[in-house]
């Protein structure tokens, strides 16, 4: 099915600009054999550019498929270069938004590496929300994780920063998701 509206703003002026045929539907999944790898289901991808808001998305995204699977592994914390990059981003956010000793929520925190980096630098507390979080991955008493999708109730958690890094590409109804976050925060900005 070709999605004809931008999932971020609803605009219908979409230009397809890049196509990949027969791409595996899972990325970052570890498998035990060549046969298992070759058996991964495949779909076509067509990237579309929204002329209204600039959002780029897969116009052929199949909303009936659960794109998360056992064996999902996105760990990059073993790379010194990547961790230096995360440290620079973390320090910049903490300085720019005066987050020393503050609470930070990361929606779509994955394994919690970025949130852990933020909290190690700012000395505050971190709350991660992600259905794919693996319990026990982080060993920091200043971190708390909710292994679930972001819900309206999460907006009641007091925090000075809510961030969402490498998450929107996993959510097809982007506008609805962002509106949920906005609505859940009430009068807070």
Descriptions of predicted regions:
Residues 16, 70, 84, 88, ...:
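Charged/polar, solvent-exposed surface patches and flexible loops
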Residues 3, 43, 47, 79, ...:
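Generic detection of long, well-ordered alpha-helical segments
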Residues 32-33, 79, 151, 173:
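Helix N-cap and loop-to-helix transition residues
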Residues 37, 80-82, 148:
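Short, structured secondary-structure boundary patches
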Residues 91-189:
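Conserved SAM-binding loop
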Residues 75-89:
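Conserved SAM-binding loop and adjacent beta-strand
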Residues 1-78:
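N-terminal juxtadomain amphipathic helix
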Residues 1, 88, 176:
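Short, conserved clusters of charged catalytic residues that mark active-site
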